[in-house]
């Protein structure tokens, strides 16, 4: 039954996939690079080799010694997944057991081990972003790394920094950290450092421009949409968090399903070879998203290193673009041996870099079943069976961090008459199914593909099973003996109202990944729009008509419209609890009843109307014809657009109230590095890279081993007629336009992980003293925005570049926060010079400090003075 369900799921993926060519080693892909409405992805070949940075030298030396002695089959094995549902993890490579390299296990999700057991369901990325707390971002990464390692997972498929949140209705915005490149960059980098500190390879995704779910994948009748992005916008907005993730040493990058400038991300040589591997100096390996490979030779030449889960675009019969086809392409010369050597060296070097050649456990769980025993290869019709789940408990005390994140993310938008915090003896009437449990049971919806009970996370591959869930209903009942609960989305007609009652109304808004449609929403928020689900707006209005004191609690994936009820006199307070994970109830009551003061801040803007956004960020839907999603708004998404257009939102980016108040004083600005030139100093030269023989291997290296027991649909590197494959000539292969094997000169903007190391010289430091001027303890967030001079051309008037959060300050207590920012932080991308340009000596730069993008408390001018506003 488990096998049949797995096959059925595979079959369901077929309509959203391209037909695989009969022999990709000799047939050009359908998705070559070409112009779209003036946007293009110029070819960039060959793929740069990894290993030229000193920080990776030891790992590459070890990898070189191993790869030099590998057979062709062993090399191909490590670059190709074994097939969908063909192992315990959502993806696994083949192995090279002669060298101690096992099948590498790759597993979702960014908030916890997906489809597993005895794991922590942490708050989602958007919740982490709302904390504006770097320490919590890092701590979550550490504990995720511990749990993934404990389950025997080599590669953690996260964090997600794309989508960036360009489209407020976008289905997967909640997996990332917020609608700003610096917030995404800091959240992503801190997560990566934490995960990899535990020896697990992190994967930054989805590279790049995957800003809506609908039409993201190519299928038989329609190509995936093309995100058409100009060079400056790409660098300053969408690439920014990826660059910081690479600077943090991330081991893997996952490509997006969509195209960029009419070239599929998984075979876009401009994105992979030039920008990622050359300009940004990425030393790890590039993998596809699942079934996001659209060609074999073309993707290898364009810089792809690993195909996941290995299958071709129709994952039914065990066909693949790589696997045996890659062996074929090497033997006939279509793919140079040097390219395969670099592919596998990058993978093995990353394995060594994380120390996984030591005491690293094998997978002890199955993402295919919760049963103790079952098929070892569920995607095969006939599979050997055995123990697949050992139920290893990896939770430790991680619930403490999960609760702290969920609590510190809670964002107080409104608190008229200081109605919050509630008193324990207040008479409470609690409304809304979002306060209660899922009536069908915990984890009853696969990949959280429903919105029933309290909303803890969105849906899709970015989820994990809940080990337990404390609902708001349970937590409130545990604290208050004077609370009545109405777990319904229709306001009851028979509710008795007393003069001292406080109505607490729970509403939610959900979204997720495109392969699941929930209540008419195919991932993106199409049906519900930006409104609350389940009659939420009416529920608030009905409560406000009956009660004089209403508190609204919102669990949401992103911006939510509030105009129908936010100004009603009875609506006294609004809390956004985001997506809290397993500690939904306890984290909320910590704040609701005043044990902690709220310290979260909005990681996006809440508009007054959806029409406040630029029209270009709406969802696009067009059957059959390829969608051209042209980013005409350029750099101006979210708060940048609102500032440029002088639109006052309902609540601005960064907004968040407290139960206390804070003052900012004594701002100072100090110079750390003199910026004597507009462009960074000359980049350091590339170091040497591993070298190997480039002779085409003996065909016998991919012959089937004798007496080999094949598993149907398992993807192997072997060929039935390897000698025949070697006879084919590469001259007939239609290489992409611009293809060459002659290396390009090193780009001037490169030189290290993330780019020219001079870009990350600390240019200035700003300090400010924050004082608790209220009557309750609390934590404050100082947000640093830069305003660049007109000499650099048109730029957003304010751009978040740093933030810092105080410790808990008692009334009257102070803390001095210091924030550093780099040359790159005050630079723009020069599309002509192809480098980052800053104002000489930082002249004309203003640094704004505040508690939101519209609540500035101090300003400093480079070359001038600082003052309190």
Curated annotation (Swiss-Prot):
Pfam families hit by this protein:
Fn3-like, Glyco_hydro_3, Glyco_hydro_3_C
Q: Which GO terms describe its molecular function?
A: beta-glucosidase activity
Enumerate the SMART domains for this protein: Fn3_like
Cellular component per GO?
Answer: extracellular region
Q: Which compartment or compartments is the protein found in?
A: Secreted
Q: Where is the composition biased (Pro residues)?
A: 681-691
- Alphabetical list of InterPro entries matching this protein: Cellulose_deg_GH3 (IPR050288), Fn3-like (IPR026891), Glyco_hydro_3_AS (IPR019800), Glyco_hydro_3_C (IPR002772), Glyco_hydro_3_C_sf (IPR036881), Glyco_hydro_3_N (IPR001764), Glyco_hydro_3_N_sf (IPR036962), Glycoside_hydrolase_SF (IPR017853)
Enzyme category, top tier: hydrolase
Keywords assigned: Carbohydrate metabolism, Cellulose degradation, Glycoprotein, Glycosidase, Hydrolase, Polysaccharide degradation, Secreted, Signal
Q: Where is the signal peptide?
A: 1-19
Q: Where is this region: Disordered?
A: 678-698
Which pathway is it part of? Glycan metabolism; cellulose degradation
For this protein, what reaction is catalysed? Answer: Hydrolysis of terminal, non-reducing beta-D-glucosyl residues with release of beta-D-glucose
**Which residues carry a glycan?**
69, 77, 261, 332, 364, 399, 425, 478, 728
For this entry, list what GO says about its biological process: cellulose catabolic process
Which SUPFAM superfamilies does the entry mention?
(Trans)glycosidases, Beta-D-glucan exohydrolase, C-terminal domain
**Main location class:** secreted
Q: What is its EC number?
A: 3.2.1.21
Q: Which PROSITE patterns match?
A: GLYCOSYL_HYDROL_F3 (PS00775)
The active site of this protein is located at 289
Q: What function is annotated for this protein?
A: Beta-glucosidases are one of a number of cellulolytic enzymes involved in the degradation of cellulosic biomass. Catalyzes the last step releasing glucose from the inhibitory cellobiose.
User: Record's PANTHER family?
Assistant: BETA-GLUCOSIDASE, BETA-GLUCOSIDASE F-RELATED
Spell out the family assignment given in the record's similarity comment: Belongs to the glycosyl hydrolase 3 family.
Please identify the protein, giving its name as recorded: Probable beta-glucosidase F
Gene field: bglF
